[in-house]
Regions:
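Conserved ATP-driven motor cores of ASCE-family P-loop NTPases powering translocation/secretion/packaging/pilus
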Residues: 429-431, 435-532
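Basic- and hydrophobic-enriched, low-structure N-terminal and domain-boundary segments
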Residues: 1-153, 157-162, 499
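Sequence-pattern detector for short linear motifs
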Residues: 9-12, 101, 518, 547, ...
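P-loop NTPase motor domains
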Residues: 141-437, 452-453, 462, 521-545, ...
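A short glycine-/small-residue-rich loop at the edge of a beta-strand within enzyme catalytic domains
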Residues: 111-115, 380, 416, 473
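Short alpha-helical interface patches
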Residues: 47-53, 64-119, 218-228, 274-285, ...
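A broad, low-specificity signal for short, low-complexity segments enriched in glycine/proline
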Residues: 102-111, 121-137, 157-158, 326-332, ...
Length: 596
C-alpha cells in the first residue's frame, strides 16, 4: 500500500515565494549585465553569482514580471505533472498480500524469550503492555489469541502446552477430561505454582467452590442468576422459542431465592444447598387457587419486616404470574436446578476453598477447571465460575493504582464451546486487555464460534489480534473464510503462442493477475505440521507448528508430566507456604480445670 500523502498546504506558498525570488533575481541580473543577449542570459543563469549575491532583488517592472512568470510557470508544471500522472502500483495491481518473515515479527518479540507468548515454532508475541511506537507504526497488540483446529491438529500440544511452559503468567484453564492437569499439574507445582483444581469429573478430588463467596451486592446476584438460567437449559446455545415469561419468571424467582440466602442467612448457610432448600418450600399446602406455600409465608414476613428488600421485590415480580404459570415455572426451575441435589455437587458447592481472588495476586497461581467430555450436565458450574473469575480479576485490577494485575493472567480455554455460554463475553474480551488479562480461545472450527455466540461472534473474533489456524477440516465455508482473511497477491502469468506454418512464429507475453495467497484447497491440504498465523496489521505467516519437545522447559514435562496430579505434594507445599508466612509464634499454657 502506498504511503499517505503529506499535507501540501504549507509547502505550496513557500515554493511560490522561492520561484518568485529566483525569477526576480534572474531578471534583475539580466538588466544589470551589459553585452550581448547571450552574455546577459549566461550571467542570469550563473549559480555562483546567485550564491554570492542572493538578495540582488528589484521592484522594477521587468524584474517583478520575471518573478511572477517564473512562479506561474512552476505552478503550471506542477499541475501538469499532478493531473497527468497515473496511479500505478507495480506488482500490486490485484492485491498486495505476501507472507511475513523474521523482519515482520521481530518488533513484536521480547529479547528475553521467557517474556514471550509462543504462537508458532518461529513466531511469538511479547507480553509487555507497552511496545514500541514509531512515526509509521504502533507495535502494541492485545494478547488475545483465537485458535482453530480440528481434532488431532495439536491444539493442546502446539498451543496450550508451550504457553503453559513459559511460566510467565497466572493461568485459568478449561480442561476437558483432565489431560492438561495430568500433563502439567505437577510441572507447575515444581515451579512454585499454587495449583487449584475444580474437578467436575472426579468430584471427590475437587477443591470446593461456593459462588456465594464472590457475591457482594445485587449486581452480582443478577449476573450469576442470568448465567445459571442461561446455562441450565438443555442447550444453552440454542435460541429459545418458548414464551419469554417462562425464562423471565424463573429468573425473578431464582434472584429472590439467591437474594434471600445472601442477605438473610448466616454466612455458613450461604450456598446453593440453602437455595435448593428454599426451592422445595414452594410446594403448596393445598390445591385451591388461594393456596399458599411455606415460601410464600416466608417472603410475606420478609416484605413486612423489610419492605425494601431486593429478595422480597423479586419474589413479588415472580408472583405476578398466574397460578398455573407459576406452578409450571416452579417445576421447570426445580428440574433445571436438580444437579444441586446430587450429593457430590452439593458437597463441593457447600463452602469455598478455591479462593479465586488469589489469581489476581503476585503469587504464582494456576486454576484447572476439569469437565467431563461425555456429558455437559455440569458445565453450567464451569460457566458461572469463569464469569465470576473475570469479574473478580477486573475488580482487583481496577482497585490497584496502575489499574492492572500485578502478574499477567491468561485464560487458556481449550474446547471453549463445551463450557456453555458466558453472558456478555463479547464485552468482557474487549475490556480485559487494559487489566493485563488475556484469553487463548480454542475451537475446532469457525462454525463452533458462530454457534456459541451467534450475534456476537464477529466482535469476539475481532478482539483477538492473533489467530492461529492449525487446520480447517473440509468445511467449504471455513476454508473460504480463512483464504479471504489471508488476502490476494498479484502474480505474473506467462502466455505463449506458437505458429507452425511456413512463416512460423513464437511469442511470449506476461500478464498480471490476482491470486489468493492460499486457495481453500491449499488450506485443506496443508501439511499437518504447518499452520497459519495472522496478527492484526502484519503480513500473515505460514509457519511450522510449535513442537512442544523443542521448548526449553520440556525436560520438566519429561520428569513430572503424565502422572496423576499429586494432591499430597500440593498439601505439603501449601503447609510449607503457610509456615513461611507465620511472623510471630506465641506459646499458650493450657491449664486443666481441677474439679476437686
Amino acid at each position: 500500500m502506498n504511503q499517505p500523502k503529506r499535507n501540501l498546504k504549507i509547502w505550496i506558498p513557500i515554493a511560490a515565494v522561492l520561484c518568485f525570488w529566483l525569477g526576480n533575481w534572474m531578471g534583475h541580473t539580466y538588466e544589470l549585465t551589459e553585452g550581448t543577449t547571450t552574455h546577459r542570459l549566461a550571467a542570469a543563469l550563473n549559480l555562483n553569482s546567485l550564491l554570492l549575491h542572493p538578495f540582488r532583488l528589484s521592484a522594477d517592472a521587468f524584474s517583478l514580471g520575471c518573478g511572477i512568470a517564473t512562479a506561474l510557470m512552476a505552478g503550471l508544471i506542477y499541475l501538469c505533472v499532478k493531473y497527468s500522472r497515473h496511479r500505478l502500483m507495480p506488482q500490486k495491481e490485484y492485491g498486495s498480500a505476501r507472507w511475513g518473515g523474521p523482519e515482520d515479527i521481530a518488533p513484536f518479540q521480547d529479547e528475553n524469550a521467557q517474556n514471550n507468548l509462543p504462537l508458532t515454532a518461529s513466531e511469538s508475541l511479547s507480553l509487555s503492555p507497552k511496545m514500541k511506537v514509531t512515526a509509521n507504526d504502533n507495535y502494541n497488540r492485545n494478547k488475545n489469541v483465537i485458535v482453530f483446529g480440528p481434532s488431532g491438529s495439536g491444539k493442546s500440544y502446539s498451543v496450550a502446552g508451550p504457553q503453559l511452559l513459559q511460566f510467565n503468567s497466572n493461568y485459568v484453564l478449561s480442561d476437558p477430561k483432565g489431560e492438561l492437569l495430568q500433563e502439567y499439574g505437577n510441572v507447575l507445582l515444581s515451579q512454585g505454582y499454587k495449583v487449584k483444581v475444580f474437578n467436575l469429573k472426579d468430584r471427590d478430588k475437587s477443591d470446593h467452590y461456593n459462588l456465594f463467596a464472590y457475591i457482594k451486592n445485587e449486581d452480582d446476584i443478577l449476573v450469576v442468576t442470568k448465567n445459571l438460567v442461561k446455562n441450565l437449559k438443555e442447550d444453552p446455545i440454542a435460541k429459545s422459542t418458548a414464551d419469554p415469561i417462562w425464562e423471565e419468571g424463573m429468573t425473578a424467582l431464582l434472584e429472590a431465592l439467591i437474594g434471600y440466602v445472601f442477605y438473610e442467612l448466616e454466612p455458613e448457610e450461604r450456598n446453593m444447598n440453602s437455595v435448593m432448600t428454599l426451592l422445595l418450600m414452594l410446594e403448596s399446602q393445598g390445591d385451591g387457587p388461594n393456596s399458599v406455600s411455606q415460601l410464600d409465608l416466608l417472603f410475606d414476613d420478609l416484605s413486612i419486616n423489610k419492605p425494601n428488600s431486593f429478595a422480597a421485590k423479586q419474589y413479588k415480580l415472580y408472583k405476578m404470574a398466574p397460578g398455573k404459570t407459576a406452578q409450571s415455572i416452579n417445576v421447570s426451575l426445580g428440574l433445571r436446578m436438580s444437579a444441586f441435589n446430587i450429593p457430590s455437587i452439593a458437597n463441593i458447592c457447600a463452602d469455598d476453598a478455591i479462593d479465586l481472588r488469589e489469581l489476581g495476586s503476585e503469587k504464582k497461581v494456576a486454576l484447572f477447571v476439569v469437565t467431563p467430555d461425555t456429558t455437559t450436565a455440569y458445565n453450567f458450574l464451569a460457566a458461572v465460575m469463569f464469569q465470576q473469575c473475570f469479574q473478580i480479576l477486573v475488580d482487583i485490577a481496577d482497585h490497584r493504582p496502575d489499574k492492572r494485575l500485578p502478574r499477567h493472567l491468561r485464560f487458556l480455554l481449550d474446547e471453549f464451546p463445551n463450557i456453555g455460554m458466558i453472558p456478555d463475553f463479547q464485552i468482557l474480551i474487549s475490556t480485559i486487555r487494559s487489566r493485563d488479562i488475556a484469553c487463548t480461545l480454542i475451537y475446532q472450527s469457525l462454525n463452533q464460534l458462530k454457534s456459541q455466540y451467534k450475534d456476537d461472534w464477529a466482535t469476539i473474533y475481532e478482539n483477538c489480534d492473533s489467530m492461529i489456524v492449525l487446520g480447517a477440516g473440509g468445511n467449504p465455508e471455513n476454508l473460504e473464510f480463512f483464504s479471504k482473511a489471508l488476502g490476494k497477491a498479484t502474480i505474473e502469468v506467462m502466455n505463449t503462442s506458437e505458429n507452425k506454418g511456413s512463416q512460423g512464429s513464437y511469442t511470449k507475453s506476461y500478464q498480471a493477475l490476482g491470486r489468493e495467497l492460499m486457495t481453500p484447497e491449499e488450506i485443506r491440504t496443508m501439511p499437518r505440521n504447518w499452520c497459519l498465523l495472522m496478527i492484526s496489521g502484519v503480513a500473515p505467516f505460514y509457519s511450522r507448528k510449535y513442537n512442544l519437545k523443542d521448548h526449553p522447559n520440556y525436560h520438566l514435562v519429561e520428569a513430572e508430566g503424565g502422572k496423576p496430579f499429586d494432591y499430597d505434594r500440593r498439601a505439603e507445599q501449601s503447609f510449607a507456604d503457610f509456615i513461611s508466612n507465620v511472623k510471630d509464634v506465641k506459646t499458650v499454657k493450657l491449664c486443666a480445670e481441677n474439679n476437686n
